Amino acid sequence: MAGPQRATSGLPTRRTTTRQPTRRAGSAIPERQTSTASPAVSTKTAAISRTRTLKSPGEPASVLAKRKERDIEREINEDTSIHVVVRCRGRNEREVKENSGVVLQTEGVKGKTVELSMGPNAVSNKTYTFDKVFSAAADQITVYEDVVLPIVTEMLAGYNCTIFAYGQTGTGKTYTMSGDMTDTLGILSDNAGIIPRVLYSLFAKLADTESTVKCSFIELYNEELRDLLSAEENPKLKIYDNEQKKGHMSTLVQGMEETYIDSATAGIKLLQQGSHKRQVAATKCNDLSSRSHTVFTITVNIKRTTESGEEYVCPGKLNLVDLAGSENIGRSGAENKRATEAGLINKSLLTLGRVINALVDKSQHIPYRESKLTRLLQDSLGGRTKTCIIATISPARSNLEETISTLDYAFRAKNIRNKPQINSTMPKMTLLREFTAEIEKLKAELIATRHRNGVYMSVESYEEMKMENESRRIISEEQRAKIESMESSLRHKVQELLTLTSKFNDLKKDNDDTLAALCSTNDVLQQTDIVLQNTRAQLEEEEMLRCAHEETEHQLQDVGKGLISTLGQTVEDINSLQSKLDRKAELDATNAELWRASSTEVSDVTKRIDQRVEAFQTRHAKLLETTSVKVNEFIATEISNIERTRSDLSEYNRSLDAACNNAKAETSSAHEDMNNVLEEIKDLREEVKSKVGEGLNGLSAAAARISEEVIGEFTQLHSQLHTSFNNLGKDLKSIFETMATHLSEQKNEINRLRAELQSSNRQNIETTHKASAHLAQAIEEEHVAAEAEREILMSQIKALVEESRQKQFARLRAKIDGVRTEISASGDMLEQATTQHDRQIDEWVFKSEQFAKDVNASKDEIRTKLQNDWEAFDQRNSTIRKATESVHKETVRIVDVQVDDMGRQMEALDDFVAKARSQNGRYRDAHIATLDTIATGVRDSYSSIEGRVENLTGRMNQFQQEATHHHATLEESIAPLSNDVRKPLTDLSSSFQNRSLEEYVATGVTPKKRKYDYISVLPSTESHEVLKSRLRTTKEMEVLPFNSDDQLSGPSSSPGGSPSKGFVYNDVEDEVGTHAPTVTNVNPSNTGLREVDANVAARPLVYSTGEKSTDQDGSPVVSPDSATEAEGMNGPPSKRRRSNSVVADTKLPNKMLARRMAGMMEGRENVPPPGISNGRRLRGRPSP
């Protein structure tokens, strides 16, 4: 036998390695009973339970525990949000080599917001707000102290807590949760993650308390749970729902081992052991990519003592979840097994996202059961657990999409509301009883295994196995009963098969009889086939005519497109000419602005010259006044000396006279020089006037020439557009008149066809009723004749004949009733088809009239639009011509004004020159008079100043120097006058010579004179008779190789009859060789009603709404069978023989003909042949 099996227990397996509390030196256990074991013990709930314990110290422990739980549930009933933390790692070597930019910004090392750059095309960046945000500069200890340490404190207070890392693969989830798991002499590495730090911190907080710590480590790989701490190779774990009180559901993992630890080092060894078993693999995104989700659970039971001395156990649990990262298979390069792993990981994470969305939206159904991951996290998301999510993200731009997804999930998870509650406390004795029961159970299994008393399992396992065997036995008996029932059913089915076989033989006999009856109706089908062939020939003619009309319509459409294209070219040319006119108008406006600027400049120059001359006059007057003052002072000073020295100057009279003559000569010379300068100014003025006049006259001539050219071009364009619009209007008028005529003809033809169709339908109905009446009469006559013959033979075979008569009469009566019913139904369907056809014809006529109205409206609208466009263009042309003429007149006016203004300026300049000349003469005369006066005074004073002549000579020398200085000053003031007056005039002349008007430059866009080609003759369709004649000739050529026996020629006496048509049968199912269908007008002179055999009513017929007509004389065409049956009893035998001969000549198999006729008769039974009738006609017509 196999070794003893271990009993499966409903409770998790534990290793009883309870750690004993360490005691400090000099302390005892009773002293620790009143000390606080943890900072969280001083919570409000603990205070309440202590208060209740003090009030009732004599109550038992169970009552105190229940009261404590009720108090806790009353106090802690508030919802709390999930704590969400974001941690951003730095760029790795791969991202640095790829030069992937950074798209994240945080508020320093620790903050609460993260800003995401959405790229240059985004309107703005995206900002997320979380409880805490850590940048890449934050180390492991910072994250632990700010995030995990408060959660550890809450766990020690009795809460269930969960921390799980969520994010893209390769963003540091495993590094955050586990990190560097090595320790040196009890000192953790700086890169140690949350789990090692939690273990060390936990045991440091529990150093002075009596407690137990147990750990479990499970893995979710490919949706299968595995225990990473189990000694077995592949332990299978199962998840069950653990329903607690008040309907709250939690999950329980069956078969998971929970190992008790007594130090942080032991816990780290378990973590290392499980991490080595965890599934990892290398991808393009991460060299050590986690391929599974892991949950490291730490459960703490702390013994506490109330103030009354009662001991109880307070449990707390911390779930540390390391999720596998979401992965893009295309970027990570996962294949085969790795691709399957990535798909399952993404599936579980998507389910987690749906759970988060459902919790945020407060949906009625939360999809926890869609994934084992969400079932494990069920209590952490929306349950009674305090939860913290650490979202890890990458700052690289290459991971922007995954980063946005991670931040969106984390941001939505903030809105999840949990209801954390402190775990129920358990008295110490209750916990010991549970441990004792489990120990006893394990001992029983161990004893059963050691003794090997025949069953290597416990009694419970053996009973369970017996129950499974009994269940299998019951299932086997049920299957055996089902087999017996199925065998009995099979026997019944065999009997039913035999019965069906006999019925099949009977039906086969009936089928043979039916086939015999079917052969008797083949002649009717053959006759119908002949009628159908004639109808097809006529349909081919109609289809050919329709195709001809369609081709003509396409040609007319092409002509219309050409006309529209020509119209588009004309409009484009008009737009180009209008653009040219706009450019010329802009050029004229620019030249006018230039002339206004020139006029302003000339006015400014003349004003400046006038101002400068006036300033010169002012300065010159001041100098003269100064000189006069100085001379007067000098004379007044020296009069006394001259009077005393006059006697001494007599000898100088001659020299004084000579000096006077010289002064007069020099003054005259200065006068002549001034006159010469003024003459040069006058010559310069005449030259400027002549040049400016020539420039303005040239400008006026150019403006006149431009105006004449523009007016000429607009006149030519006006005539061309007038001709083009007239031609276009004529063409459109011709097209619309043709369309209106065509629509009117179609309307008349439709009315005529409607009248003919109604007459034909009435005649067809009357003929059908007559045939039905004749058929009933013939049946009665045959019945009477058969009765007479049976009475003669009654004496011999009375009984046999009576039975035969009754059967024959019953069969005949049934067939006749069926035929009569089908004929009536056929008449009703014909009336319905006629009504429907009339309604469709009315709709067609209405649409045609509507179309004609639309065409007329479009014609009037186009005519109005063309007239409006022409009037607008004519008005625009007149406006442009007037504007051009006004521009020319304005240019001439401006030029005349400029010439007049220049003349006035030159006249002012002449006045100035004359004024300068007169002033110079007066100055010369005054100077000579002054010299004469001085000379006379000197001569009179010679006698008195001779004694002082030496002093006078010195003073005269000084006066001469001053006079020379003043003379030089006068010359210096005169020289700038010439420059100030001449230079502005020279600049003005140069400006006029260098400034030219802008000339029009051809752009090459102005359209050239072109010839518009368009079609003036519209295509038309040939006459119907010519087209039909051509089709008949073609068909005659096609039937030449066949014998005359294969053709059915119509009677030569039929009016308008076509040549003989051949019928060629092809043994292909449902295939008839016909030409493409055409539609045309119907020639009423060659139409007739096809024959309809009274016995052809085997199936309902669908009547088409095609065109129908009557004969030339309006009488219906009746089939030979109907005619002979109407004439009497001698007709049917000869007619029957005629039908059989026709069938024999066609040589068409009966079955194939029946199938073909069934397809060809569908919808075409009573379509009258348009145009020409090739069918067989009656040998005699009934009188109308």
UniProtKB/Swiss-Prot annotation:
Domain Kinesin motor positions: 81-416
Comp. bias intervals (Low complexity): 12-24, 1049-1060
Stated family: Belongs to the TRAFAC class myosin-kinesin ATPase superfamily. Kinesin family. BimC subfamily.
Protein name in the entry: Kinesin-like protein bimC
Record organism: Emericella nidulans (strain FGSC A4 / ATCC 38163 / CBS 112.46 / NRRL 194 / M139)
Superkingdom of source: Eukaryota
Keywords: ATP-binding, Cell cycle, Cell division, Coiled coil, Cytoplasm, Cytoskeleton, Microtubule, Mitosis, Motor protein, Nucleotide-binding, Phosphoprotein
Coiled coil, from the record: 489-900
